[in-house]
Amino acid sequence: MKKTKIAGICLIVLILAAFVSVPVYNNYCAYNVEKMLCETPLPEQTELIEAISQTGKLTGNGNGMQYFGAILIKSELSLEELETYYSDYRSNEWEYLVEIQEGQSIKVIEHKALQFSEEIEDSGYYIVYSWGSGNSLLKELDI
């Protein structure tokens, strides 16, 4: 009787730990994407304004977990110059993507509302973003 009770308590603790640890791990994966962007040297005439990350089903159809990281930069360089600069850091087609940022809302995120806190009132703001990956088993288990 005592062993059954202890085994039951252990099982409950393991299940509760999974409910906490899997989302924490997935958020950590998204944070690593953000960190990678922040640690990348900025081009000249460019300043880092803000960084953000998000995990979840963010775009497209089907299931699965997506890890998104982005930085908001203000630059005197053109979009083409920034794309050329960041293309040197790309290891695949989902990293270091550059777009003009108008307003606070991040438009590449379809299924969640994600926005920068910085008010964007004029031109010269760009978003540099990457889609990351993590352990394929845990990304399917986010609760």
Model-predicted regions and their roles:
Residues 2-69, 74-143:
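An acidic-aromatic pocket/loop used at catalytic or ligand-binding sites
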